[in-house]
């Protein structure tokens, strides 16, 4: 039987990422053959990964890789935020973003078939990571973004990589693009313009806003404050020419009732119309980038800021780790029991 030296164990660990005891056991089983030991560890890793396949992985990191006119944003999930800080996990996320930017796969299946720098597929790398790290590791989603030579990428990660944003802007420069990405990270727009919002979605969101007003009015009534009116509209898509014309007529009637001389109406009406539009585009402000108040200058919307610097947003991608994933909610006792059971089964 071959002697299992510390040097041999170290070599296997460096090649496989396995722990000391796992590496030593594998070498003993295959009589010191490194290649057979790697294959054995891979098989055991696949078995461990299969046991973890039904677990919920809602933590993790985003990764961004930019090269020339191509950028990739990825979300890689783990089960705990502790593992998300693991050096091996961080390296895997960064390598994933790089190979996806270079390979430009169309979907997750194609992405997992890409070859990593180690020579193994991305899927095999995730199986190995699941086995060695001890948690389910999975590629949740990715986006490949491309630009022209005249355009600029804005790449930004926030909160230790939990949020990743890439924007593409026409005009301006990289500094402006990055500022826009910082805004996107903070304000969570889902689309660029109101024209991309679904009509029923706007109606549903408007109903939610008015429900919130009703609740606020209940509190206001208790302290004898006047009730706030319901919002009639929520998006520019609902502000037809007829609606705008009627709003202007209502403002003129209001000014006449207040006794304001007609010769100064032209100075008052534009400001009141701006206020009308602001009050009746709350859904746009929540979900569309261009309608949001710019976080770097709250006197402007993002659209107005971009116009002031002769720039425009072509597209953007924003990933936030775990968004839309329903996390398991266990009490502490159940969590400890589950952890102990998992340890016994591994």
Curated annotation (Swiss-Prot):
GO MF annotations, alphabetized: translation elongation factor activity
Q: Does the keyword Cell wall biogenesis/degradation apply?
A: no
Keyword annotations for this protein, in alphabetical order, are: Cytoplasm, Elongation factor, Protein biosynthesis
| Protein biosynthesis as UniProt keyword | yes
Q: Where is this region: Involved in Mg(2+) ion dislocation from EF-Tu?
A: 80-83
Q: What is its main location?
A: cytoplasm
> Which GO cellular component term is one of those annotated?
cytoplasm
Q: Which Pfam families match?
A: EF_TS
Q: Which domain of life is it from?
A: Bacteria
From the Swiss-Prot or TrEMBL record, state where the protein is found.
Answer: Cytoplasm
Known PROSITE patterns for this protein?
Answer: EF_TS_1, EF_TS_2
HAMAP family (alphabetical) = EF_Ts (MF_00050)
* Protein's job: Associates with the EF-Tu.GDP complex and induces the exchange of GDP to GTP. It remains bound to the aminoacyl-tRNA.EF-Tu.GTP complex up to the GTP hydrolysis stage on the ribosome.
Family as reported in the entry's similarity comment: Belongs to the EF-Ts family.
Q: What is this protein's record name?
A: Elongation factor Ts
Gene that encodes the chain: tsf
